[in-house]
């Protein structure tokens, strides 16, 4: 539900800008390396039997932005992995498990950038789960497709900051380096560290939502088409 008002706000802003002034266009090719997590209160409450471990994921894609001076709006289309890692001890037996989500991501955001290229961004991201794979090691090793236990899609709120610097003054190509943080708005559902569905009332009488979270480093190249370069200074 949150995505719709954000989309309408971005579209209204874009139309308003286009009627009042010429705009700059930013085309970006980028990748991001993330620390990724899937948080659920029922897992958190299970102590040493189910514990979180650092998970890592990445994505890559293309972005398009519209800019007027310091203010801009943008969107991206990305493909990537969001992985959640777990570890625990059952009957003195250690185990480790992983949930690997293959996702399509559509972030929409507002961006504020000064003349030095430093920027701050905030918005929301639509995440489509293309596939979910669960694996467990040491304790009864298993690998299974758990896509049916996850929501078809979920959304996250995002904030980020970084810098966009031109490589050469004579070339409208910049190097982008930044950090982006995300946290789940909608329930991603899913399985626990054992691979059991989190909506199974036999194991979890009190249902708890699953929140996807990530923190990562953005690296990319941005090509700028600036219709008022001399006037704006960007």
Where are these regions (language model features)?
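Gram-negative (and chloroplast) outer-membrane scaffold detector with strong preference
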Residues: 63-140, 149-175
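Predominantly the C-terminal beta-signal and adjacent terminal strand-loop region
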Residues: 152-234
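Extracellular/periplasm-exposed beta-strand and loop segments of Gram-negative cell-envelope proteins
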Residues: 36-55, 78-101, 128-155, 186-197, ...
């Amino acid at each position: 539900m949150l995505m719709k008002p954000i989309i309408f706000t971005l579209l209204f802003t874009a139309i308003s800008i286009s009627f009042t002034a010429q705009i700059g266009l930013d085309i970006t090719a980028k990748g991001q390396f993330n620390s990724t997590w899937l948080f659920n209160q029922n897992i958190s409450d299970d102590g040493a039997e189910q514990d979180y471990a650092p998970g890592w994921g990445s994505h890559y894609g293309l972005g398009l932005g519209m800019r007027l001076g310091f203010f801009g709006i943008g969107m991206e289309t990305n493909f990537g992995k969001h992985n959640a890692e777990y570890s625990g001890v059952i009957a003195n037996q250690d185990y480790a498990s992983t949930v690997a989500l293959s996702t399509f991501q559509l972030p929409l955001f507002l961006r504020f950038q000064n003349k030095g290229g430093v920027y701050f961004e905030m918005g929301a991201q639509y995440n489509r789960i293309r596939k979910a794979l669960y694996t467990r090691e040491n304790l009864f090793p298993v690998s299974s497709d758990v896509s049916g236990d996850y929501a078809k899609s979920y959304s996250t709120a995002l904030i980020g900051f970084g810098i966009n610097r031109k490589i050469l003054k004579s070339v409208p190509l910049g190097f982008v380096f930044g950090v982006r943080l995300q946290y789940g708005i909608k329930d991603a559902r899913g399985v626990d560290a054992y691979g059991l569905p989190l909506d199974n009332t036999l194991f979890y009488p009190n249902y708890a939502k699953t929140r996807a979270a990530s923190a990562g480093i953005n690296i990319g190249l941005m090509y700028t088409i600036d219709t008022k370069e001399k006037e704006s200074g960007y």
